[in-house]
UniProtKB/Swiss-Prot annotation:
This is E3 ubiquitin-protein ligase CBL-B. Residues 483-497 have a biased composition (Polar residues). It is an enzyme of class 2 (transferase). Residues 1-14 have a biased composition (Low complexity). The lineage of its organism: Eukaryota, Metazoa, Chordata, Craniata, Vertebrata. GO terms for molecular function: calcium ion binding; phosphotyrosine residue binding; ubiquitin-protein transferase activity; zinc ion binding. GO terms for biological process: cell surface receptor signaling pathway; protein ubiquitination; regulation of platelet-derived growth factor receptor-alpha signaling pathway. It comes from the Eukaryota. It holds the Pfam family Cbl_N3. Residues 355-383 are annotated as: Linker.
Amino acid sequence: MASSSSSSSSTNSSAVTGRLPGARSANPRKARILGLFDAIQDAVGPPKQAAADRRTVEKTWKLMDKVVRLCQNPKLQLKNSPPYILDILPDTYQHLRLILSKYDDNQKLAQLSENEYFKIYIDSLMKKSKRAIRLFKEGKERMYEEQSQERRNLTKLSLIFSHMLAEIKAIFPSGQFQGDNFRITKADAAEFWRKFFGERTIVPWKIFRQCLHEVHQISSGLEAMALKSTIDLTCNDYISVFEFDIFTRLFQPWTSILRNWNFLAVTHPGYMAFLTYDEVKARLQKYSTKPGSYIFRLSCTRLGQWAIGYVTADGNILQTIPHNKPLFQALIDGSREGFYLYPDGRSYNPDLTDLCEPTPHDHIKVTQEQYELYCEMGSTFQLCKICAENDKDVKIEPCGHLMCTSCLTSWQESDGQGCPFCRCEIKGTEPIVVDPFDPRDENRCCSFNDSLCTPMLDFDDDDLREECLIMNRLASLRKMNERQNSPVTSPGSSPLSQRRKTPPDPLQIPHLNLPPVPPRLDLIQKGLARSPCASPTGSPKSSPCMVRKQDKPLPAPPPPLREPPPPPERPPPIPPDSRTCRHLHHTENVPCRDQSTQHDAWCTRDISGASQPSICRVAHDGSPKLGVPSSSVLNGRHSRMSTEAGFIRHKHHKRRESPLETIRVYNGLSGNEEYDVPPRLSPPPPPPTITIHPAIKCPLLVNSVSDKVRNSAEEDDSEYKIPSSHPVSSRLPLHCHSIKHFPRLCENGQCLSNGTHNGISEIKKLKQPDQGDVIATSTVPVPLPSARTSARENHPHGSSLTRTPSDYDLLVPHPGEESFDSSPPSQPPPPPPARTCVPEHAMPTASGCRPNSDVDLFLPHSDPCPEAPLPPARRGPGEAKSNRLSQEYDQLPSCPDCPQAPARPPKPVPRRTAPEIHHRRHYNCDSLAENVDAKIAKLMGEGFPFEEVKRALEIAQNNVDVARSILREFAFPPPVCPRLHL
């Protein structure tokens, strides 16, 4: 080994290998001779190994057994401390038997015997066993003297056997060969190995040295010899991927690995090569009167980590293994604190500060999907999911999960084994720097620039830049983190990484899709009062939005003053700054105001972005955050066509590329209503704009939107505008043929997406008689059954919800038909009859019951917690029929050729027209079932799972307040952004 310890340690290291295996020679002439021998051996190369068949393995076992019997001599008095050869050799024997049992038949055994690594390993094991036997023969009585050179050589062989056991277990975990899949801890070191050696498990030292020299120059043959003795832990003239991983972890970082090795192993007097725990203690005993004396060695029980032994102020000798930091940093910190002052008792303590040059941290950028996902859960990607207080600043290697340093330290100090998330062995850590999500980086924002029909795929973020950056600056204070494969996917993801996977459905994410975190009972106690955390079910905290939602009851619905909308053939001009819902009954649209104030209250914990649920909706789409008055926000999204459509388009692409993409692809919002935020109040803006939802891909029934616009007395016909983002004929008479790809809407009566809540509700309010019918005259949006109620639509009580032409006079086709496949009628149909949900939605008496309609999201209710159910993501017509019961959680690819529908229009105000009253009476028989559905939808909108809501309502006998209390007591709602001010 390349040791700078005293010459005694240098001579000690030469006995086992016959040359200088670890120490430098004080004699330059001898060093040159040894270097010449090494060069000759490199030129010749190691001999080829014979096949390691069963006979060879059994012969090796006999040699190992003989070594064990020799070491069991009572006169030897071996100490039962690592490395204990009487444990190591039997363990090696057992693991070899396990390997042979996995390759029992002849074909597999032949494959094993020809395995390059296994042949080299068995040959080396046989040679080391013979060498140990020779020690006893040559040493004779000196073997029983604890301080003799022969005894020291036996101890060194014990260390080598220990390294070999660790290596065979790493390459053959559970007896199966995994050398080609071995994961090197440091990413840059792994890249080096893959580049030069591919999937090889072991390479000759000569080849390894040449390849390493191309990246890190090796100055001389003597340095190469010393380097080999450091890396070649098993002393077999080969470098395995396992040994390379250990070396890179010990002398990290990779960019300066040889420089670090020279400072720490070659020139540092405190480095001890191949020393054991007992030997370190014995060596420091002579410095017991000199506190601060220290030496360090490779840990034999935790390969890849350092063990530092030092003398305390009271003369005791302690040994410690530093965690989560390079050795030079641990030595610098210990020197500053007065623990590591005199290496090997010497007065000169090398200055290692030069090794502390700032190394570039692993910058992790938050993807749009991660950003939206964590916003929907009321958290931020960079927030540590264990404590929910600090930012993630460290990455665990090799699994890639992310967390804050304080949590990792606490976990390790409490004897936590492995990664807190996946329990994978922690082989190292890397500091990370979180970069905030910036939509400009990937053209995620778009602006319509007053164009009437800007194609949905054109990305132009100029208009949104300023607003998006507001959120991004806030988020940057908390430093958002990318995937570690980035991820990071926190981890996911976490991390990580890291290996980003398609984000799961937001409808399920809060409960299922994030890695579990270590339980934090203390945090669970104060979960509701603490900042939000994006961890999954195991998360110690629940989102404060769930607490504060209950504080702001929504006002009763405004009086029904709505008029029938004009014909749907309206032109679609839409000013970019128009607001759809901003000026709809400003005085009555209290939910908007509540939304704004609630955002402020909800995010009071930290504007730095640790928990930005308020901005989580907005930041993504660029709407103002945290009390900043939103000029126009639909469901917490900026209603500017530029902002919302920009993200819609991006999500549109995402849905096309990955069918399982989450529903939150709507302007960065989850398709489920529980994550949508009702529009905020803001000064009356220009005429309203209608954003098109990518998942809907249809020009949303503009007359429905105009219907809402008509809701305001001061609005004129100019407010009937088709979304400027319409990629298809914006002047079409708002036919539902564009909705033909929404069988979910038709088949389940569900809201297509959060972006279409209003429009869909409008669609629903217009009884859809036939596929593709135009919603022309319906003025009162009849709520569509929520995503959660879709599963119940097949139930008997939902007969009114059965998708029949009679039930959906205007829009919904018969279940047997392809939804909206028929060509749209050229003329607007008569006012549609109210759907089953109408009694709750339109009748003032039912205002307390939240209808299943998604449009109800925008309806102010007297009930303090009207939350709409989670709308499912859109799916293809064929899929919708086959998966009706599971649609609420499905994330489905958008139809690329389908026109895009606007995002949520403003809240429709129920009107009491004769047709509605008539239909209300007609479906009054089912109002009870719909009331139950509305209650389920309301509680689901607060973030509780469907099954728990259903069970709680059964226990509470359909009493919403009692059910809510039960859910809060026994089911932690996932942290979500407040959408309705519940």
